[in-house]
C-alpha cells in the first residue's frame, strides 16, 4: 500500500526489528535512558539481571552515567552490530498494536515511525510539538549515540487526543484476528507487554483515515500529536 494516505499526518508505517521468539524478552526490554536518573542502583540491578544476554540496555546510554567517555559510545555501537545477529523484521511496512499492563491499569498504543519534518522544538506551530523545554546540554550524548548507529531504539511517546477512540481501540477490539508478536513480563515489576502486527492494507487505511479526520477537525495550525516522553530523542 502506498504511504500517500499518511502524507501530512506525522506518522507512517515502518519496519520494526524484534528478537527471535526464543529470546529472553524480559531481559531485552528495558526502560528509557532518561528514567531513574538519580537511582544508579536501579541500573545496577538491571545490569545484573541482563548479564550477557541481548538487551536494549546495551544500546542506550542511561543519563545517570553521563558524562560518558568516547569508548562507551563505541561499546554501544558494537552492541548494536551484535544485536543485528539476533533481531529479525517482526513487522514490515506496518505498525505494532501494543498493550501494556501495569499496577495502575492497562495502556494501549501503536508503534509507528514519526515524520520528523512535522516536528519542531522551538515553539513553531507544527503538527507534532514538545511538552517540555528542550535542554540543549542533554542533546550531545544522544547525538553521539546516533552518529553512525546501525540501530534506533527510540523511546519517543506521542500523545493523541482521540475522545471517540477511533484510531487504536478498533484494532484492539479485533486483536484476535491479528498476528501476535510478543507476550511477556517486563523487568523490575514494570508490568506486562503484548504486541500484534498490523500490516493489512485495510487496517492501515483505517488508521490513516481516522488520523486525517482528527487532523481536519483541528482547523488551522493543528496540533495532532504532543510528545509525552522522549522530548530529547
Report the location of each language-model feature:
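Catalytic-face loop-and-helix region of soluble metabolic enzyme cores
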Residues: 206
